């Protein structure tokens, strides 16, 4: 496999943005990663996800589950590259579930696929559903791991890249102090 610079591909795809952002957590940042911009470019997405597929070669799993929305395309492409089934979980009445005829069988070894892992919240919601159905989560695969050091998951993370993006409380945000307007790029509804 050739040496793939994931950060460069994210920048070329306008997926790694710089500016002033209000994150779904309510914190502010000067950088934001919007992997949907990468995923609209199939050839670039294929290259980046090949980095994850390479890391999964030694992992024993038989199915991939991506939470909607961000994990759906990642699940598909990772499934294509690893020759494993790829399905997705979605919310119904606010609760994550497996539907549309998809199933997790007792004993299935599952990789959860995501675009970006920040807090791990959606991955952990999906893991709960998988485990309730009798599956075993053996890892989380993602394009970007941007967890802070204090954010832990119970599962190994297989990422194409690790990004450390600083975040700030509104009161400590230098960009706010400079009156630079923010944008809300997140995928979760602001509360």
From Swiss-Prot:
EC number(s) given by UniProt: 2.4.2.10
Residues that hold 5-phospho-alpha-D-ribose 1-diphosphate according to the record: 114-122
SUPFAM superfamilies: PRTase-like
Catalytic activity field: orotidine 5'-phosphate + diphosphate = orotate + 5-phospho-alpha-D-ribose 1-diphosphate
Record carries keyword Glycosyltransferase: yes
Positions of orotate binding: 118, 146
Keyword Nucleus recorded: no
One Gene Ontology MF term: orotate phosphoribosyltransferase activity
Pathway: Pyrimidine metabolism; UMP biosynthesis via de novo pathway; UMP from orotate: step 1/2
General function of this protein: Catalyzes the transfer of a ribosyl phosphate group from 5-phosphoribose 1-diphosphate to orotate, leading to the formation of orotidine monophosphate (OMP).
Family under the similarity heading: Belongs to the purine/pyrimidine phosphoribosyltransferase family. PyrE subfamily.
Protein name, entry field: Orotate phosphoribosyltransferase
Gene designation: pyrE
